[in-house]
Amino acid sequence: MTEEEIFNKIADMISERFSIDRDKITKDLNFQNDLDADSIDFVELVMDLEDTFGAEIPDDDAEKLQTVGEAVEYIKSHQN
């Protein structure tokens, strides 16, 4: 899967979960600062990422994901 395909899937997921316009989602979007995501929102988002991409994201790694771009890079580097 290409970086663009990963980004598009993540952006669609965020748009649906947080009810924001898909066009406003960029790689620089910060989960906590821009989305006001609390810890439950973030855990649910990580679970969605795991389900969508078939990857297991350990808690230590998940805590380091601050932006959409970081999530894209993580998924890209951990693809099967």
UniProtKB/Swiss-Prot annotation:
Compartments, record wording: Cytoplasm
Modified residues (O-(pantetheine 4'-phosphoryl)serine): S39
Pfam families: PP-binding
Keywords: Cytoplasm, Fatty acid biosynthesis, Fatty acid metabolism, Lipid biosynthesis, Lipid metabolism, Phosphopantetheine, Phosphoprotein
PROSITE patterns associated with the record: CARRIER
Pathway the protein takes part in: Lipid metabolism; fatty acid biosynthesis
Keyword Membrane carried by entry: no
Annotated Gene Ontology cellular component terms: cytosol; membrane
Signal sequence extent: none
PANTHER family given in the database record: ACYL CARRIER PROTEIN (PTHR20863), CARRIER DOMAIN-CONTAINING PROTEIN (PTHR20863:SF76)
Entries under NCBIfam families matching the protein: acyl_carrier, PRK00982.1-2, PRK00982.1-4, PRK12449.1
Alphabetized HAMAP family for the sequence: Acyl_carrier
Name of the molecule in the record: Acyl carrier protein
Organism: Lactobacillus johnsonii (strain CNCM I-12250 / La1 / NCC 533)
